[in-house]
């Protein structure tokens, strides 16, 4: 199964040069270097808590700012997930998780439906976490959903520390993605849709 549920994406523009490898049936092993330390930290959360093996290498124009690299990593990772899922046969399809981190609690609910949509409700008071612009969190997820074809709802239940809120978000996201992409043995080789198909981005 693992050999069928992995993919590699290479994406090069005038602004960034990115390669992503993902194994959906992995052990949470990651090698990540984007040039954006806080983004690296969040991507490690996706790998570790989702149990996805993940290799990401990005070179971008971070001397200008982090926006292009942050967005393009989201694009490439979304494409990698979509390619690894293929026709999405046998997957559970839906996932949800509540993740706490100290005072913060974030809920993520998602559907690997082939219908890209983001509802985003994080209230981040700090303009930056370290050197990372907190506006880029939403930009990352916009890029991801548009290229993975998932419906994603992110809801902050409570929290005051921006770092805690964002990290709880990524942890909840990783566990929800793990739940949604895992194989449902009762579905065997069928597509989890009454229509008989799910769009593949």
From Swiss-Prot:
PANTHER family reported in the protein's UniProt record: IMIDAZOLEGLYCEROL-PHOSPHATE DEHYDRATASE (PTHR23133:SF2), IMIDAZOLEGLYCEROL-PHOSPHATE DEHYDRATASE HIS7 (PTHR23133)
Protein name: Imidazoleglycerol-phosphate dehydratase
Entry similarity comment: Belongs to the imidazoleglycerol-phosphate dehydratase family.
Record pathway: Amino-acid biosynthesis; L-histidine biosynthesis; L-histidine from 5-phospho-alpha-D-ribose 1-diphosphate: step 6/9
Lineage: Bacteria, Bacillati, Cyanobacteriota, Cyanophyceae, Synechococcales
Pfam families: IGPD
UniProt catalytic activity: D-erythro-1-(imidazol-4-yl)glycerol 3-phosphate = 3-(imidazol-4-yl)-2-oxopropyl phosphate + H2O
PROSITE patterns named in the record: IGP_DEHYDRATASE_1, IGP_DEHYDRATASE_2
Residues making up the signal peptide according to the UniProt record: none
NCBIfam families: PRK00951.1-3 (NF002108), PRK00951.1-5 (NF002109), PRK00951.2-1 (NF002111), PRK00951.2-4 (NF002114)
GO cellular component, as recorded: cytoplasm
Top-tier EC class: lyase
Gene name linked to the record: hisB
Organism annotation: Prochlorococcus marinus subsp. pastoris (strain CCMP1986 / NIES-2087 / MED4)
Statement: the UniProt record of this protein carries the keyword Cytoplasm: yes
UniProt-listed InterPro entries: IGPD_sf, ImidazoleglycerolP_deHydtase, ImidazoleglycerP_deHydtase_CS, Ribosomal_Su5_D2-typ_SF
Enzyme Commission number(s): 4.2.1.19
